[in-house]
Design a protein with these regions (language model features):
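Short Fe-S-cluster ligation motifs
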Residues: 236-240, 244-281
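FNR/FR-type flavoprotein reductase catalytic core
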Residues: 71, 75-217
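Ferredoxin-reductase
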Residues: 1-77
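Short, Lys/Arg- and Gly-enriched loop/turn segments at beta-strand edges
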Residues: 42-49, 88-97, 238
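Local cysteine-cluster metal-coordination motifs and their immediate loop/turn environment
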Residues: 116, 191, 213-243
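Hydrophobic beta-strand signal
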Residues: 35, 80-84, 227
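Structural signal for conserved beta-strand scaffold positions within catalytic alpha/beta enzyme cores
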Residues: 6, 51, 158-160, 210, ...
Length: 281
């Protein structure tokens, strides 16, 4: 069992959880993720590592309640059954930051994508690199960790669907006019957002890295649930990724696979809600 220090709501439908997991944070490099199990019989939830304290052995995650497993996790108070990680490959820029010191870098974060973007930007800032960020959300109240992000970025621009903060529109509306100013782009967020970012950056011949978030089960590549088509070849997000060249991803197939079990997931989510409410009483 792993001790939970807190599990708090940070926006509508999103939570931040802090867990004591010294072995997980010991060797982590931003861009990696972990699998979290709320209980012994729970499904494994792949969560990007949002922050970590290697001295105290604490790992932090921000997650959105989008199904039965994350609904169950949102009710956790004192401990979780398992935390496995770090998994996946580190971010290319963080791993080889010396090679990017003279490059102009822009990160594009959508919604909860701000969580995995933050440790990468902070890591690069701590190693002397200046990074710009474009952050988007449906509305101002859903923009995560603004204060923390603003301390480590060179420049940050915001976009909200309803215009309540920053540019009214999407992150691509902000990116398109300035894309030629950069040498590399990293996009993290909903699948459709990453696809539209790649559509824009391809026009500008701007190299783009995306962090794929497909269905995932075991985190070892054995189950094949997280398979993606990259440059026409099968890759597994859990071991080869989660980051890939965005211009080589088959997003149509990726989004189709994401929706494969949508009805079953909704039914299971409804059952989980009823069970948790019953246990609460």
């Amino acid at each position: 069992m792993y001790k939970v220090l807190y599990n708090k709501k940070v926006t509508s439908g999103s939570y931040e959880i802090a867990i004591e997991a010294p072995l997980v944070v010991k060797k982590v490099i931003p861009g990696q993720f972990a699998l979290v199990m709320a209980k012994e019989d729970s499904e494994r939830i792949p969560l990007s590592i949002y922050d970590y304290d290697q001295e105290k052995g604490i790992v932090y995650f921000i997650y959105q309640v989008v199904g039965a497993s994350t609904e169950e996790l949102s009710y956790v108070k004192d401990e979780v059954f398992g935390v496995v990680g770090p998994l996946g490959q580190p971010n290319e820029i963080c791993k080889n930051f010396e090679d990017f010191k003279n490059k102009k870098i822009v990160y594009v974060a959508g919604g909860v994508g701000m969580a995995p973007v933050y440790p990468q930007v902070k890591y690069l800032h701590d190693h002397g690199l200046k990074v710009d960020v474009i952050a988007g959300a449906r509305s101002a109240d859903l923009l995560l960790i603004r204060d923390k992000m603003e301390k480590v970025v060179n420049k940050i621009r915001y976009a909200t669907d309803d215009g309540s903060f920053g540019t009214k529109g999407f992150v691509t509306d902000v990116l398109d006019p300035i894309a030629d100013d950069y040498d590399i782009c990293v996009a993290i967020g909903p699948m459709i957002m990453m696809k539209t970012v790649c559509d824009v950056t391809k026009k500008h011949n701007l190299k783009t890295i995306v962090s794929m978030n497909p269905l995932m089960v075991d985190g070892s590549g054995m189950c094949g649930a997280c398979r993606c088509e990259v440059d026409g070849k099968p890759k597994f997000a859990c071991i080869h990724g989660p980051e890939f060249d965005g211009h080589k991803i088959d997003f149509s197939l990726a989004m189709q696979r994401m929706n494969t079990y949508k009805e079953e997931e909704k039914e299971k989510w409804d059952q989980m809600k009823k069970r948790l409410e019953k246990e609460k009483k």
